[in-house]
Regions:
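Transmembrane alpha-helical core positions of polytopic small-molecule transporters
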Residues: 17, 93-94
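Structural motif
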Residues: 30-31, 106
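Hydrophobic alpha-helical segments typical of transmembrane helices
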Residues: 2, 11, 63, 83-86, ...
Length: 114
């Protein structure tokens, strides 16, 4: 289901019919992966990346993920309407207020996922 949407029908067909191995850098170029980490610094880089995600506004990230998933099936007009609704919801969260205050106070935000 996902592979043709990520890499296109022709490439997905070739990969599935041939069983060819795909190296990480090639998978990244095809859009199958977001990021590839070097073997030498893998654990350090992965933990830094995970820490970055963990310190983001998780409520907003969840809403964004929901919108991305819905966008696969919505019409353009319906998606714009959904995004408007979600924007209003997101703006009422504690994390939104924290983000705005942190920006105005020139400090790093401390999001709570609320």
């Amino acid at each position: 289901f996902f592979l043709p949407r990520l890499v296109g029908f022709q490439r997905a067909t070739a990969l599935m019919m041939t069983g060819d191995k795909v190296m990480a850098t090639e998978a990244q170029q095809m859009g199958m992966l977001y990021k590839v980490f070097a073997d030498e610094t893998f654990m350090t880089d992965v933990l830094a990346f995970a820490n970055t995600l963990a310190n983001m506004p998780t409520k907003a990230m969840g809403l964004t993920k929901r919108l991305l998933n819905e966008s696969l099936f919505n019409t353009h007009d319906k998606q714009l309407a959904r995004e408007g609704i979600i924007q209003v919801d997101a703006a009422s969260t504690s994390d939104y207020a924290e983000g705005v205050n942190a920006f105005l106070e020139k400090r790093k935000p401390e999001f709570k996922g609320k």
